[in-house]
């Protein structure tokens, strides 16, 4: 009705312009529009406020109390929230309120186009700030990266040699027991393996690039946390002066200085048929898939580092901790590796056949996913769910990983069972969801639905190749006194960065199997 009035307004104006009248009409329209917007906003907030709030603060309490409570007790707050409402509740975080939904809504929201992961990440990681431009939904880097991950990345499996070289450097050929930091070495190894595919031989062993790709994610995290200490309205003005944010900007420039010459060299080669070469890495694939879309090659590579290095190395570390805690799985794993590699070699088909390894990976991820809240989304349009729960535009939502410990899905869910998913081979209803790369309502570690992690297939191959080399070449165990503890910060769950492993090189092993 209001739109019709605006469309017909020119017909109702007098032929002879009356400037004061026109000004009054314009001001009236603006006032009506403002009142309408305020009324809608108030109504949205009213409907949202009907849901219980966990971690709120009193009138005379500082918001810092809620932030600290969230950062150090998010898990307890989630459990408390579900005692107040089994459907949905609000929770104050270090940045804003998030609407927590019951896992019952997983299938209802998983493919809803009105819910955006990229916009949620942009809000969480301040994508409007130039230093954190990788999180800006307007840059299109997420679409470009998604295309590469889905269409190209798993076409290459030239990773076994790189895994061998990286592991030899980190764990050495020492046949005597020696101590090392598990997670630090996993970050270095995963960075090398990933960079082999991301950047090819030109840069994958470059110490400067490996330092950037290992540090960038951590620096972004600390940069965002440092800037969030300032009021939001000051972010556009103070970000240049925050030391942690400047570090991120400096690293972006370092990445540009390393990657741009490679891109320019390849562009020059492409202009001459005699010097044209074929490359199999993300620099080449991005050029092929761009289809006219502008993108920054350095930012794209840093985006891959954000998505791949620390998430994969964190999970690989946790898997090693679990194998150390349950050493009875080591011999069956080695037997599986030898059997599969003899028949299939280090191929995609071979890696897919490693069912016990796949099960141990998935079980490790079930018990310790990367975060306790998954399926993060920003609501782009007002939505009313099937049972009446209202999701107002502009609010973030998420679903906890409670289903990972639901006894209706898992027998004895608190216990680590390396064969848990192998046993599902005999269950036709769950056979498809048993694979490490499969997503389902009962296993949300990679998300579920439209925004499920597109890099999970590459991560699976990468982890399996690394485990094959580690298990076949080394004996390893927890150092005396090392007791891995899951580190919790806000939603994030991290494997223990302080764990020491004792390792030594095995003797009498046919390592040629690893390169078939």
Swiss-Prot record:
Q: In which pathway does it act?
A: Secondary metabolite biosynthesis; terpenoid biosynthesis
What EC number(s) does the entry state? Answer: 1.-.-.-
Pfam families xref list: p450 (PF00067)
**This protein's UniProt keywords:** Heme, Iron, Membrane, Metal-binding, Monooxygenase, Oxidoreductase, Transmembrane, Transmembrane helix
According to its UniProt record, this protein's enzyme class is oxidoreductase
* Primary location recorded for the protein, binned into one broad class: membrane
Q: Which residues cross the membrane?
A: 22-42
Any one GO MF term held by the record is:
iron ion binding
CDD domains, from UniProt? Answer: CYP503A1-like
Lipid bilayer topology: Single-pass membrane protein
The record's InterPro entries line, in alphabetical order, gives: Cyt_P450, Cyt_P450_CS, Cyt_P450_E_grp-IV, Cyt_P450_sf
Q: Which residues bind heme?
A: 453
What are the subcellular locations of this protein? Membrane
State any GO CC term.
membrane
Q: Which SUPFAM superfamilies match?
A: Cytochrome P450 (SSF48264)
What cofactor is needed?
A: heme
User: One biological-process term from Gene Ontology?
Assistant: secondary metabolic process
Q: What does this protein do?
A: Cytochrome P450 monooxygenase; part of the gene cluster that mediates the biosynthesis of the meroterpenoids nectripenoids A and B, as well as cochliquninone D and isocochliquninone E. The pathway probably begins with the HR-PKS ntnH that catalyzes two chain-extension steps to form a reduced triketide, which then primes the SAT domain in the NR-PKS ntnG to initiate three more cycles of extension to give a linear hexaketide corresponding to the polyketide part of nectripenoids.
Q: Which family does it belong to?
A: Belongs to the cytochrome P450 family.
Name of the featured protein: Cytochrome P450 monooxygenase ntnM
Please name the source species: Nectria sp
């Amino acid at each position: 009705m209001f739109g019709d009035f605006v469309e017909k307004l020119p017909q109702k104006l007098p032929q002879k312009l009356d400037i004061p009248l026109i000004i009054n009409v314009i001001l009236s329209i603006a006032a009506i529009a403002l009142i309408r917007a305020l009324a809608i906003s108030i109504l949205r907030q009213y409907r949202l406020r009907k849901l219980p709030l966990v971690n709120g603060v009193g009138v005379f309490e500082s918001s810092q109390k809620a932030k600290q409570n969230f950062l150090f007790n998010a898990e307890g707050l989630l459990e408390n929230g579900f005692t107040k409402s089994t459907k949905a509740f609000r929770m104050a975080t270090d940045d804003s309120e998030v609407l927590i939904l019951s896992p019952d809504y997983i299938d209802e929201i998983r493919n809803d186009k009105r819910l955006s992961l990229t916009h949620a990440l942009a809000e969480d990681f301040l994508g409007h700030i130039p230093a954190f431009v990788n999180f800006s939904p307007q840059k299109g880097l997420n679409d470009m990266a998604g295309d590469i991950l889905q269409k190209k990345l798993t076409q290459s499996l030239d990773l076994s040699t790189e895994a061998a070289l990286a592991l030899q450097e980190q764990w050495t050929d020492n046949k005597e027991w020696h101590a090392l930091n598990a997670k630090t070495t996993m970050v270095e190894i995963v960075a090398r393996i990933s960079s082999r595919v991301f950047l090819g031989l030109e840069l994958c062993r470059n110490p400067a690039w490996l330092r950037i790709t290992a540090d960038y994610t951590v620096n972004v995290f600390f940069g965002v946390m440092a800037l969030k200490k300032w009021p939001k309205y000051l972010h556009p003005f103070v970000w240049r002066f925050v030391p942690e944010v400047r570090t991120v900007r400096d690293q972006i420039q370092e990445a540009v200085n390393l990657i741009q010459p490679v891109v320019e060299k390849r562009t020059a080669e492409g202009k001459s048929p005699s010097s044209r070469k074929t490359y199999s890495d993300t620099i080449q694939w991005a050029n092929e898939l761009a289809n006219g879309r502008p993108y920054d090659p350095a930012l794209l590579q840093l985006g891959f580092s954000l998505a791949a290095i620390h998430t994969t190395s964190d999970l690989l570390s946790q898997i090693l901790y679990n194998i150390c805690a349950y050493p009875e799985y080591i011999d069956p794993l080695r037997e599986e590796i030898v059997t599969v590699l003899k028949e299939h070699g280090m191929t995609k088909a071979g890696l897919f056949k490693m069912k016990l390894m796949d099960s141990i990976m998935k079980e490790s991820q079930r018990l310790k996913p990367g975060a306790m809240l998954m399926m993060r989304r920003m609501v782009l349009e007002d939505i009313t769910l099937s049972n009446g729960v209202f999701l107002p535009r502009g609010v973030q939502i998420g679903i906890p990983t409670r289903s990972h410990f639901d006894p209706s899905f898992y027998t004895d869910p608190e216990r680590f069972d390396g064969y848990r998913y192998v046993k599902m081979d005999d269950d036709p209803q769950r056979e498809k969801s048993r694979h490490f790369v499969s997503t389902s309502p009962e296993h949300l570690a990679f998300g579920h639905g439209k925004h499920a992690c597109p890099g999970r297939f590459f991560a699976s191959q990468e982890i399996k190749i690394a485990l094959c080399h580690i298990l076949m070449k080394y004996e390893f165990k927890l150092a005396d006194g090392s007791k891995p503890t899951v580190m919790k910060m806000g939603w994030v769950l991290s494997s223990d960065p302080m764990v020491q492993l004792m390792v030594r090189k095995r003797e009498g092993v046919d390592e040629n199997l690893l390169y078939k």
